[in-house]
């Protein structure tokens, strides 16, 4: 039509071109409006057709982490009457943990966590071995907690250790089984106190008197003091009362899955009386403290320490009342010359942050742990290969590649605290890790 108008002289060529341009712009504008209306309509339809999850599903939180590790050990041993041996061992290992927490009511929570490992209480590591065979998964946590008030929480089942403590006596992988109570109160704006109680099961014995099962009662009282805006001091005293240990009967001391077998292998000779009942006793005090300082250095720094003493350890009594039912000769204890071997201590520091991408963190401690200071079955499984009668250095560095991905390097440089009974055992260990949280 515009061309006809130009042919009849009613429109000039320039006027016709201008009119065509305006018409094209109007056409583009209308197309954009139609497209926008269609998009908005699609959004509204998506809102009305979106699947709404049940409220109980929204209360569930899932989490997990994967750790890939290269682990090298260098060991030098010289047992009494034998030649010195040296060897080193390389292993490629992993740890996988998958957890779920559900807020069942305003005051209650249920949690479950699965983990890799061999089933031992103080490790979740699993080696890549056995020509690619499948790996086992265990129940690492299964608990219910109730918080009836802000100052009180009660947890039952297999749960996280609530105690303020150190790896000198508790490996972080140990999740006690039983009931725990945690209380905390603010005395002033700068001073708070806390208490943790534990009633935890050690063994379930196949005997008629179920009240005699070995049990641990833990009592902890501590305080948190805000010395200044950037300085916090935390300390606690804990008593561990191991009950009914004399009901444990002599068994296969080579079975490291048992309480007596694990302890016996890891420097704690288990001694039995003429009725083949365990004589070893544990009634342990632990004192721990940590000082946290911020804003003095470019990164936070912490100083910490721990001391443990088993007041029930008595080498003379073990030698006097003990017999040798098969693989536990009390005469071997003569080499300790009456020393009860009942204490241990740790001091260290950490520096850095471990929260987000670009953060770095470093930690160092030195420790000494005598044979009978605390049950070997619960202490750090990596330091000196696990167990007691050790001393040495621990150092670790971390760098956060992403908020949820970190690279770690850990070193253990250890030896026997006392070589008089079991001989020399020096062990150095390097672990290189990549840890991914999800």
Language-model regions: role of each:
Residues 106, 226, 230-386, 391-392:
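Detector for outer-membrane/organellar transmembrane beta-barrel domains
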Residues 69-95, 101-150, 163-171, 206, ...:
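Surface-exposed loop and membrane-interface regions of Gram-negative outer-membrane beta-barrel proteins
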Residues 64, 68, 96-102, 142-146, ...:
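Residues on the lipid-exposed face of transmembrane beta-strands in outer-membrane beta-barrel proteins
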Residues 106-110, 150-154, 186-195, 228-235, ...:
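Repeated loop/turn-to-beta-strand initiation elements of outer-membrane beta-barrel proteins
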Residues 424-438:
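Outer-membrane beta-barrel "beta-signal"
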Residues 119-142, 146-228, 234, 238-278, ...:
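Surface-exposed coil loops of outer-membrane beta-barrel proteins
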Residues 1-81, 438:
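N-terminal periplasmic/intermembrane-space "pro-region" immediately following the signal or transit peptide
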Residues 68-74, 106, 114-120, 160-162, ...:
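Transmembrane beta-strands of outer-membrane beta-barrel pores
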């Amino acid at each position: 039509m515009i061309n006809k108008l130009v042919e009849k002289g009613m429109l000039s060529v320039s006027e016709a071109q201008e009119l065509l341009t305006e018409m094209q712009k109007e056409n583009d504008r209308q197309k954009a409006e139609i497209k926008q209306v269609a998009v908005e309509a699609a959004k509204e339809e998506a809102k009305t057709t979106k699947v709404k999850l049940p409220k109980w599903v929204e209360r569930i939180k899932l989490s997990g982490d994967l750790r890939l590790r290269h682990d090298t050990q260098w060991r030098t041993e010289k047992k009494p009457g034998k030649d010195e041996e040296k060897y080193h061992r390389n292993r490629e290992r992993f740890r996988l943990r998958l957890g779920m927490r559900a807020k069942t009511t305003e005051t209650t929570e249920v949690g479950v966590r699965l983990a890799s490992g061999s089933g031992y209480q103080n490790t979740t590591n699993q080696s890549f071995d056995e020509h690619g065979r499948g790996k086992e998964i265990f129940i690492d946590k299964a608990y219910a907690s109730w918080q009836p008030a802000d100052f009180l929480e009660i947890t039952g089942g297999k749960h996280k250790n609530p105690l303020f403590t150190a790896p000198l006596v508790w490996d972080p992988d140990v999740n006690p089984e039983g009931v725990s109570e945690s209380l905390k109160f603010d005395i002033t704006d700068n001073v708070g106190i806390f208490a943790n109680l534990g009633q935890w099961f050690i063994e379930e014995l196949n005997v008629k008197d179920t009240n005699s099962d070995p049990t641990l009662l833990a009592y902890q009282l501590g305080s948190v003091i805000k010395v200044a805006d950037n300085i916090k001091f935390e300390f606690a005293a804990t008593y561990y009362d191991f009950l009914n240990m004399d009901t444990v009967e002599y068994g296969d001391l080579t079975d490291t899955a048992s309480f007596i077998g694990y302890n016996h292998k890891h420097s704690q000779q288990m001694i039995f009386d003429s009725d083949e009942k365990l004589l070893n006793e544990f009634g342990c005090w632990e004192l721990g403290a940590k000082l946290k300082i911020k804003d003095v250095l470019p990164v936070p720094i912490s100083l910490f320490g721990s001391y443990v003493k088993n007041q029930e350890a008595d080498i003379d009594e073990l030698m006097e009342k003990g017999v040798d039912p098969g693989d536990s000769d009390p005469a071997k204890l003569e080499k300790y010359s009456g020393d009860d071997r009942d204490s241990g201590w740790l001091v260290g520091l950490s520096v850095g942050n471990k929260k987000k991408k670009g953060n770095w963190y470093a930690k160092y401690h030195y420790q000494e742990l005598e044979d009978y200071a605390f049950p070997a079955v619960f202490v750090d499984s990596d330091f000196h290969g696990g167990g007691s009668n050790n001393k040495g250095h621990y150092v670790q560095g971390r760098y956060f590649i992403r908020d949820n991905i970190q690279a770690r390097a850990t070193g253990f440089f250890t030896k026997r605290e006392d070589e008089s009974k079991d001989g020399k055992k020096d062990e150095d260990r390097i672990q290189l890790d990549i840890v991914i949280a999800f």
